[in-house]
């Protein structure tokens, strides 16, 4: 859904990053109109934003030319969302106190659209009690969402919190402001990625899972309001914003981390491509090729989904007060996808299972898109196709109904 975005730019060194943010918004189809504070113009010229948006830039409350084109009240009504990035300590203080002494703060008071605030400033300023109190005031204000700043080296040379997050993070939080919070108050546990089973210090058994589907599901659950923990095997993917990530390598490590957390969640969704077997006698040193045996003795890994199903899954009778998460598995099959997935769901004791095809041109391993089939109870299979981001959102929308039963 294309959004009408009013981007407020206040006067900090991070103002130059707003140019990249505008490009990202326009690229995905959003319509953007920029409003700048007087101090912001010391860092970036209005002409830059006008060139990027092909729209006039608001800089002063009583600019007759701008008011003739679109007045500040009309701009406030036009917006689907007001995004303040970067938000300086000064502008945050004005917002918290309800001040309206320039065009930007006037629009912020007049709009009934969601307001997304992305603070960016020196670490010591960000940590100051008054700034934190003002941010808390905004968090408690209806329709306001505060994006936490990144930590790292700042323009002033200090290291700490205060950096403006990258555009993908801001865009994800922008979308979250428009997402129905169907998972609000829910705790979700996901596994993702491959596992690696060591043969020796240089070799291991693994599979080509990229982890993209699991990470997309983590991001989508967070967007829908859930508190998300992601237990991840080795991947090259960035952690979705707001998601707690636990890194593991082997299937045994993943089993331990998942089982330790499952009792406290509402959904346990096992997306990881976990190795079924591991070398029985791994070496902690690299074994010379000349000394390696022609055969490799293997032993079974613990079955994470089966153990979840046995403890919490379908058909298990628990105490009335006992938390029992919805157990959802994934089945990667090369043939007879629906039938084999349905059998796996029953065998493992899962409440639901998501089936996808691997092998051949439609394999989902490492791909950007996917076609999956959701099997839940006696319901007819539901099929979802698209990018993994789109499929993840559709799966959660479908599963949200099962959480209400």
Regions found by a protein language model. Name each.
Residues 1-405:
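A cross-family phosphate/adenosyl-ligand binding-site feature
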């Amino acid at each position: 859904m294309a959004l009408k975005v009013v981007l407020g730019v206040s006067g900090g060194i991070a103002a130059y990053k707003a140019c990249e943010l505008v490009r990202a918004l326009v690229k995905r189809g959003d319509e953007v109109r920029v409003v700048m504070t007087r101090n912001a113009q010391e860092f970036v010229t209005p002409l830059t934003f006008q060139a990027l948006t092909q729209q006039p830039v608001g800089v002063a409350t009583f600019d007759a030319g701008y008011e003739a084109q679109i007045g500040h009240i009309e701009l406030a009504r036009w917006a689907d969302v007001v995004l303040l990035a970067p938000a300086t300590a000064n502008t945050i203080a004005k917002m918290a106190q309800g001040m309206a002494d320039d065009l930007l703060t006037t629009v912020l008071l007049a709009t009934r659209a969601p307001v997304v605030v992305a603070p960016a400033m020196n670490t010591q300023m960000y940590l100051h009690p008054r700034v934190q109190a003002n941010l808390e005031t905004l968090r408690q204000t209806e329709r306001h969402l505060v994006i936490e700043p990144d930590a790292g080296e700042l323009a002033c040379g200090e290291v700490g919190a205060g950096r403006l997050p990258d555009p993908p993070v801001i865009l994800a939080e922008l979308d979250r402001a428009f997402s129905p919070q169907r998972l609000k108050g829910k705790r979700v546990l996901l596994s993702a990625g491959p596992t690696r089973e060591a043969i020796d210090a240089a070799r291991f058994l693994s599979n080509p899972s990229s982890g993209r589907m699991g990470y997309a599901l983590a991001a989508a659950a967070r967007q829908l309001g859930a508190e998300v923990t992601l237990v991840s095997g080795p991947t090259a993917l960035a952690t979705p914003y707001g998601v707690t990530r636990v890194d593991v390598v082997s299937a045994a490590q993943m089993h331990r981390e998942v089982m330790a957390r499952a009792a406290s969640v509402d959904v346990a969704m096992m997306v990881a491509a976990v190795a079924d077997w591991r070398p029985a006698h791994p070496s902690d040193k690299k074994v010379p090729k000349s000394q390696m045996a022609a055969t490799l003795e293997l032993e079974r890994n613990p079955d994470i989904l089966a153990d979840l199903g046995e403890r919490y899954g379908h058909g298990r009778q628990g105490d009335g007060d006992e938390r029992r998460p919805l157990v959802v598995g994934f089945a990667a099959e090369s043939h007879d996808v629906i039938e084999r997935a349905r059998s796996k769901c029953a065998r493992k004791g899962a409440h639901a299972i998501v089936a996808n095809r691997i092998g051949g041109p439609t394999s989902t391993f490492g791909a950007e898109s996917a076609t999956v089939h959701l099997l839940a109870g006696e319901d007819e299979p539901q099929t979802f196709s698209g990018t993994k981001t789109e499929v993840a959102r559709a799966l959660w929308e479908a599963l949200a109904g099962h959480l209400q039963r």
